[in-house]
């Protein structure tokens, strides 16, 4: 006897299961809404009760996108009592996270078509181009509001600056664009992202414009600016913050010296350089630097010796400040860590569609980090600086 062969249409079955799950989710959510309404009114529908706190007045429909697909919620209308449902609030939070993801995708240069495909794969329904366009407008408004917010941290004694280079499309050609970033430690000892702006290139004009923009928003009380050596930035510091001192990042200084040192000798030279900044006073560091210069010349590393001799003084400015702060103010590490996170995010984009989208994504990431423990955890005890402000070398 021949056996009967049953053929199953896998796609049909998947579709039926998906619809079954979606329907179950919709039914469950609506039942929960009814239970919430009963709890608020302290009575079931049509129930006569002296304990009743409010009355029903029909329903209104609310569409929600869930991981199981689109569902329609029949939200009870109530009279005499406010109905703030926890069900919808939970989905509002989920919707916000979805919105943030869509915004980040768009800012990263993902095409509208690709965003549609991704949303369909994740949530079972496409986000329309009109919705993406609205999210884009909303993103730019929110980020611009944050970027131009007044700085309300009081005084900012320590400011760290750097430039991040990203690739963008300009009239069909690809070029580098600099995004200038500044963070600070405020008078209470907390780190704060001051802002970011497109600088085109790290020249004096870009830095002057950047610093003036920060001052206009409330940057005040700057005692020290830490950053890599950039002549445009140094000239801008002297013009916009004449009372502030400059500290060249020691890590960047080391790298500059290593650029003229054979790989086989980098480790020994690194130990020699670190020994300079391990001294307990500026005078001792200067003496150690002279010794290192002589040793480098003896090792036939004349170019390295010249770089140390010419550049060491601007790496010792931190010695004019409280010793308790030295390890935190002689390098740009506090901003470098942020930059690594930004580069990790922007690397997947490769080339941005324009400079503004690059700036917006950098700002979106900075705003996110600022809202985490990074910005809520005390970074320095500023009482040490307060006690030292009587010293004319700092107070200026």
Where are these regions (language model features)?
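RNase H-like nuclease fold core
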Residues: 74-79, 87-92, 125-126, 131-226, ...
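DNA-recognition alpha helix
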Residues: 113-124
